UniProtKB/Swiss-Prot annotation:
The keyword Electron transport does not apply. Pfam families: Arch_fla_DE. Keywords: Archaeal flagellum. GO terms for cellular component: archaeal-type flagellum. GO terms for biological process: archaeal or bacterial-type flagellum-dependent cell motility. To M.jannaschii FlaE, also to FlaD. The keyword Nucleus does not apply. It comes from Methanococcus voltae. It is found in: Archaeal flagellum. This is Putative flagella-related protein E.
């Protein structure tokens, strides 16, 4: 591999994330807190940075957005009962909910019809997999 090829791989052009920044309006702040609360309930407060890193690696959130999300998460207090009781892994449905939060933070509204269609499509794929693979 020559130097030009190697440098082009290393200096690959930046592909924008689905969520580059967190909007500054109060509506977005509410959505951020609700999203972080959702994640904390699923994986525990201390595991939220790992989830955000996973979303970064998927190209869903930028490093700039993660920095702001982490600032928000520092302001979230948990009841003693909630601390580290939910340290499970996120399900596919949990990731889809996160993706919907990301879309809303980008100002995109997802209609209930689109959600119903998505849910129907997921059920159809699952049913096909069950029939094909005998799951």
């Amino acid at each position: 591999m020559n130097t030009a090829t190697l440098s082009s791989i290393l200096l690959e052009s930046h592909k924008p994330a689905k969520l580059e920044t967190i909007p500054e309006d109060s509506y977005s702040s509410i959505f951020v807190f609700k999203w972080l609360e959702y994640l904390c309930e699923r994986v525990g407060h201390s595991n939220v940075p790992d989830v955000l890193e996973f979303y970064y690696n998927l190209g869903w959130v930028s490093d700039k957005a993660i920095a702001k999300l982490l600032k928000f998460s520092k302001g979230i207090g948990l009841d003693d009962d909630e601390i580290e009781t939910s340290v499970g892994k996120l399900t596919i449905a949990d990731h889809l909910v996160s993706l919907l939060f990301i879309e809303r933070l980008n100002g995109k509204k997802v209609s209930s019809e689109a959600l119903d269609k998505l849910e129907w499509e997921i059920r159809r794929i699952k049913k096909g997999a069950e029939q094909y693979y005998g799951i």
